[in-house]
Design a protein with these regions (language model features):
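Long helical/loop segments within the catalytic core of UDP-sugar-dependent glycosyltransferases
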Residues: 117-153, 159, 163, 177-272, ...
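Short aromatic/hydrophobic "clamp" motif used to bind/position activated sugar donors
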Residues: 166
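A short, conserved alpha-helix in the catalytic core of glycosyltransferases
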Residues: 262-265, 273-298
Length: 478
């Protein structure tokens, strides 16, 4: 019994030590993020985007939209994507074995006809049945292929495209009109950049018209509001901070841009993966650096994409478990990066961070709650210590989230009404009472399910921005 009490006693200090380390890391990332965003906003204000593309040689882009059973939003989505601001871009819609009217709607609304184009398979994908061109929109291409999933659809489109830049989005992503101008800029400024990600925002509560966010607002759902703050914190602080170390391991599957030659050189997306958006980024870092090529994956803090967040516990739970499984899978597949000096900051700092705090973090957090309350019940930990610890954790979480809201307001000002800013700050406080614990529990369940071999992808049920969505490919903060 004495041994068990000692284990419980010292485990509490282990959790406290873990908490202090992660607080230190987050404070460092926050300081770096404030500096980076301040510099970025000054640079963006100094020169107009369109002026840059008039002066410099721009790189043509291919926008890839995997679509499986997207009959409820495919027409509006394609119409809006055809109106993006960019000098030269191609739009490829991949019909991934849809069993609904997705293909029929594309025929009816975009005047597509089958071409004689024969694809050259530089990377492996399911067979392409046909390639269609539009008589009304010269830059629109539609691919019909056997069902193989999102990653396989992207690979098929890469085989068709010959443009140097590849942008991948979800069929239900809502893009800013100038998103391609913003996402392509880093490729023009640095030839070593192989991938760029941008900030994804929550569209729940926003007014959407003709495929674009017309008025930014907040959802009436507290679950959606919690995710707004969560996304602000993850993108403006987390990814922006890691960008300083060239340590971005995840680019959101809802909107990302890559150099085509880099994707082809590593064999394209991994089909059958739970988290293909993270795996491809980690593999780019690993394989290109192994070949001694100077590479950089970077992040722009601009809000370039809007996505629908789950508003039910069931759907949100499924999403977070899937994200956790995807993270574990990517870490397991590329474990050779762990404390590997060859990969510098990536191997010695960023990858270990993901192992200790993203993979095993949920276990430590959930077990920490359990052991802590057992300690209180048995009198191992004094009540005043517990009060101080939980107060510090609450204060830290609130400050971190509130800083993210303030940084958004100072830099991008998407939420212009005072009522919404007040609501966001209230949300930043309330998320510490339940929401954060639920997300830790869902991630912990994702870890357990992965360990026991339950690695299914699952569905992401959506209401849709016009209240008529159906399940399809899931958008993600990832």
């Amino acid at each position: 019994m004495d041994i068990l009490i000692k284990i419980i006693y010292y485990y509490n200090y282990l959790v406290l030590f873990y908490f202090l380390i992660i607080v230190t890391i987050y404070l460092l990332l926050n300081a770096i993020s404030f500096r980076n965003i301040s510099r970025y906003t000054k640079k963006v204000k100094f020169v107009e985007l369109k002026e840059i593309f008039r002066i410099h040689n721009f790189k043509p882009i291919t926008v890839i939209v995997p679509a499986h059973n997207e009959e409820n939003n495919i027409v509006q989505s394609v119409h809006s994507l055809l109106q993006l601001e960019y000098p030269d871009y191609q739009l490829i819609v991949v019909n991934d074995g849809s069993t609904d009217d997705t293909m029929k709607l594309l025929f009816d609304h975009f005047h597509i006809r089958q071409s004689s184009f024969s694809p050259y398979y530089e990377i492996k994908s399911k067979p392409i049945k046909a390639v269609y061109l539009s008589s009304a929109y010269p830059n629109l291409v539609v691919i019909s292929k056997e069902n193989g999933g999102k990653a396989d659809s992207i690979n098929a489109a890469i085989n068709i495209s010959k443009n140097p830049l590849i942008t991948v989005i979800d069929a239900d992503s809502i893009l800013e009109r100038d998103c391609l101008l913003k996402i392509a800029r880093p490729f023009m400024e640095n030839e070593n950049i192989v991938a760029v990600g941008g900030t994804v925002r929550i569209a729940n509560g926003c007014k959407v018209n003709q495929g674009y966010v017309e008025d930014v607002g907040l959802s009436k759902s507290w679950l959606a509001r919690f995710q707004v703050v969560e996304y602000l914190r993850a993108f403006l602080f987390g990814r922006n901070g890691f960008d300083f170390f060239n340590g971005i391991l995840i680019i959101s599957g809802a909107f990302s841009c890559f150099r085509r030659d880099a994707l082809v050189s590593v064999g394209g997306y991994l089909t059958g993966s739970i988290g293909e958006d993270m795996e491809i980024v980690v593999r780019l870092h690993k394989e290109l650096r192994r070949k001694n090529k100077k590479t950089k994956v970077t992040f722009i803090p601009d809000p370039v994409c809007w996505t629908e967040a789950p508003e039910t516990f069931k759907t949100l739970s499924s999403q977070r478990k899937r994200w956790q499984k995807g993270t574990i899978e990517s870490i397991r597949l590329h474990k050779s990066l762990f404390f590997n000096l060859r990969y510098k900051w990536m191997g010695m700092l960023v990858f270990p961070y993901y192992v200790f705090f993203e993979v095993f973090g949920p276990f430590i957090e959930i077990s920490g709650y359990v052991v802590f309350f057992i300690s209180l019940f048995l009198g191992i930990v004094p009540l005043n210590f517990a009060v101080v610890f939980f107060s510090a954790a609450f204060l830290y979480g609130t400050v971190l989230s509130t800083l993210a809201v303030c940084l958004e307001e100072l830099s991008f000002k998407k939420y212009v009404r005072p009522k919404e800013l007040i609501l966001l700050i209230i949300t930043a406080i309330l998320e510490n009472f339940g929401y954060r614990q639920f997300t830790a529990w869902w991630r912990f369940r994702g870890l357990l399910e992965y360990v026991i071999g339950k690695r299914s992808w699952g569905k992401m049920e959506r209401k849709g921005f016009e209240n008529n969505g159906k399940p399809g490919y899931s958008p993600a903060m990832r």
